[in-house]
Amino acid sequence: MAVKVGINGFGRIGRIVLRNALQLGNIEVVAINDPFIALDYMVYMFKYDTVHGRYKGTVEVKDGKLVVDGHAITVFAEKNPADIKWGSAGADYIVESTGVFTTVEKASLHLQGGAKKVVISAPSADAPMFVVGVNLDKYDSKYQVISNASCTTNCLAPLAKVIHDKYGIAEGLMTTVHATTATQKTVDGPSHKDWRGGRSVNNNIIPSSTGAAKAVGKVIPSLNGRLTGLAFRVPTLDVSVVDLVVRLEKEASYDEIVATVKEASEGPLKGILGFTDESVVSTDFTGANESSIFDSKAGIAISKSFVKLIAWYDNEWGYSRRVCDLLVYAAKQDGAL
């Protein structure tokens, strides 16, 4: 049995959610909506990917549908979510991955077309936010619109939870060295709200704001107000890294912290929080399924209460895998799976 899903927005996350869904088998993508991508171009965009490689199965157009490995997917091209006939395609759960309809009010428009629930693949100002491995116990089936938070929050929150549960985080600062995303400029151009963000991504390290650290306080309330951070956008295509500096409430040696994280990665957070003690670099994590991979060799401590912790994440693939996990979890809790 599989949860029947529709995807709104066939961009980076939309396409990679589909790739993940095809791997997992417990999600059946029955419909895709994107008003800006013609069906034949949709085939091309899904088949070829600069980061994750060529799709190894079959991708074609047949009878006006996108057919992947023999599985037919209905395609819509509506600009208004309220006009998408999700119900006619049998799509119960919607992945809202346009980056546009990120509030409860806007995302709820999907419900008018027959959808039962919407998962926003981005942070939301007012939708309940969930991070797999951190706060799924707070999920309630009454929620019709939920958020999977951001890729960076998904990396940071599991690590922060492990450290906070064991040692207590008094306060912390996070920096994410973040790969390029689609909203950035290839050459210098206008960006009235974020002047630095208008500079070319190809030859710059660009400081940027991020709400990822503060958002951890929404999924771990006891950390609310204790974490904040910033981002540096760098000229790489994929895979990012979180640098978390924390002051601990309970003293611990760096080796003790490493042992704690490793234990969690092999136990309750297996598959969510990874662990490496090898001399790795960013491309070694392309296609990593985990939300966060702790790098024990990269962290440092200045004392038993002040430490820097490093965790890698594939901001495209790992995040999309969690979108799928959240869909399946919600469907099970709702009795739909």
UniProtKB/Swiss-Prot annotation:
List positions binding D-glyceraldehyde 3-phosphate. S150, C151, T152, T181, T210, G211, R233
Q: Which reaction does it catalyse?
A: D-glyceraldehyde 3-phosphate + phosphate + NAD(+) = (2R)-3-phospho-glyceroyl phosphate + NADH + H(+)
Q: Which domain of life is it from?
A: Eukaryota
Show the GO MF annotations: glyceraldehyde-3-phosphate dehydrogenase (NAD+) (phosphorylating) activity; NAD binding; NADP binding
Report the EC code(s) recorded for this entry.
Answer: 1.2.1.12
Q: Fetch the NCBIfam families from UniProt.
A: GAPDH-I (TIGR01534)
Can you say what this protein is called?
Glyceraldehyde-3-phosphate dehydrogenase
Q: Which organism is it from?
A: Schizophyllum commune (Split gill fungus)
Its gene is GPD
